[in-house]
Amino acid sequence: MPIKSRIRSIPDYPKKGILFRDITTLIKDPVGFRLVIDSLTQHYLQEGMDFDVIVGIEARGFIIGGALSYALGKGFIPVRKPGKLPADVVSQEYQLEYGSDTIEIHVDALVAGQKVLLVDDLLATGGTALAAAALVEKVGGIVAEMAFIVNLPDIGGERKILEKGYSIYSLTDFEGE
């Protein structure tokens, strides 16, 4: 059973008119979770992509990024919501559909020039991913690529990210669905 068929779709969540792609059904299934991590691991081993560390975006990016870090023998760095990291941080505000939000990373999370694989569960508008990329660059890192389980290309995040010059890899797309 492929990855896409293990993802639950919830209409009108978190608000009317949104079709939410819920990966919890995918990752609660041990075969599904293994399929995600093994697929990403094989992709990055076969590509031979040069990166030093994985940066995961709170919260589901921690689940995927942590397991992938272990599988690839790479370190893991969290990007968190404000007030969750104990040492000095750098912050990045970004726009949501209604309002704004902020994410943070430790000032000393990366060494200048370190190459990063940025990981999250889903790419929709691209706002969170671009904010995380800005944080990585503020602390001296270089984004080698962004990886997602799900890409929703019709929402426009993929286009925004590619226009900024970043590379994207996703395991599955939901186009026009």
Curated annotation (Swiss-Prot):
Reaction(s) catalysed by this chain, per the record, are: AMP + diphosphate = 5-phospho-alpha-D-ribose 1-diphosphate + adenine
Q: What is its EC number?
A: 2.4.2.7
Q: Please give a single GO biological process term from the UniProt record.
A: AMP salvage
For this protein, what is any one GO molecular function term?
Answer: adenine binding
Per the record, the pathway is:
Purine metabolism; AMP biosynthesis via salvage pathway; AMP from adenine: step 1/1
Q: Which Pfam families match?
A: Pribosyltran
Source domain of life is Bacteria
User: Keywords on this record?
Assistant: Cytoplasm, Glycosyltransferase, Purine salvage, Transferase
Residue pairs linked by disulfide bridges in the UniProt entry: none
Q: Where in the cell is it found?
A: Cytoplasm
Name the InterPro entries on file. Ade_phspho_trans, PRibTrfase_dom, PRTase-like, UPRTase/APRTase
Tell me which HAMAP family the record gives: Aden_phosphoribosyltr
Its annotated function is as follows:
Catalyzes a salvage reaction resulting in the formation of AMP, that is energically less costly than de novo synthesis.
Matches recorded under NCBIfam families = apt, PRK02304.1-3, PRK02304.1-5
Q: Please give the name of this protein.
A: Adenine phosphoribosyltransferase
Q: Species name for this entry?
A: Pelodictyon phaeoclathratiforme (strain DSM 5477 / BU-1)
